[in-house]
């Protein structure tokens, strides 16, 4: 079973990732002439995060057999890496200029001359960074669970021998 704090983080992250997926999906769908690998990777990162963190993580909360700390930690770490890389790639692509500067918009591969696309790219960068920080917190929760319960959620320490004596002790 996952801690309730971990599930709350995953619920907030679900909202951020859905918004980021909508924004980046809109950017990918309205690309006019240029190829945008940054946007395509951001769509992948948001979809991968939704699938592995939100859906699998919440499923692991309700079905304890799927709450393997090693799997959750690997997913959280991969999601951290993917969302950080996607947010940084978009941020480097838009180069943080004003979306009202037409000279900048015309020369930018992501904005493609549209201030609306520029604002969508800036917003998707922000939401991907929000998700990145939540993935860091989720990875910390998973690492704590991994250190306490072992790779597959079972403690490596045997249960203490207390209670009623056995027949051989009588």
UniProtKB/Swiss-Prot annotation:
Membrane-crossing segments per the record: 12-32, 39-61, 77-97, 126-146
Single GO biological process annotation from the record: actin cytoskeleton organization
One Pfam family matching this protein: MARVEL
Main location: membrane
Gene Ontology cellular component terms for the protein in this record: eisosome; extracellular vesicle; plasma membrane
PROSITE patterns: MARVEL
Main function: Involved in membrane organization. Involved in a novel pathway of export of proteins that lack a cleavable signal sequence. Non-classical export pathway also functions as an alternative clearance/detoxification pathway to eliminate damaged material, when the basic repair pathway is not sufficient. Regulates actin organization and subsequent morphogenesis and pathogenesis.
Family: Belongs to the NCE102 family.
Name of the protein this chain belongs to: Non-classical export protein 102
Source species of the chain: Candida albicans (strain SC5314 / ATCC MYA-2876) (Yeast)
């Amino acid at each position: 079973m996952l801690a309730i704090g971990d599930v709350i983080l995953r619920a907030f992250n679900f909202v951020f990732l859905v918004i980021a997926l909508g924004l980046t999906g809109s950017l990918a769908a309205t690309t006019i002439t240029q190829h945008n690998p940054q946007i395509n990777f951001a769509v992948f990162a948001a979809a991968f995060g939704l699938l592995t963190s939100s859906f699998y993580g919440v499923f692991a909360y309700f079905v304890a057999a799927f709450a393997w700390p090693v799997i959750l930690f690997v997913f959280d770490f991969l999601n951290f890496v993917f969302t950080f890389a996607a947010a940084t790639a978009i941020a480097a692509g838009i180069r943080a200029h004003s979306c009202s500067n037409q000279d900048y918009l015309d020369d930018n591969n992501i904005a493609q001359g549209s201030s609306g696309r520029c604002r969508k790219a800036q917003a998707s960068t922000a939401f991907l960074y929000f998700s990145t920080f939540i993935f860091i917190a989720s990875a910390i929760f998973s690492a704590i669970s991994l250190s306490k319960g072992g790779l597959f959620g079972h403690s490596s320490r045997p249960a203490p021998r207390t209670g009623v004596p056995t027949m051989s002790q009588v």
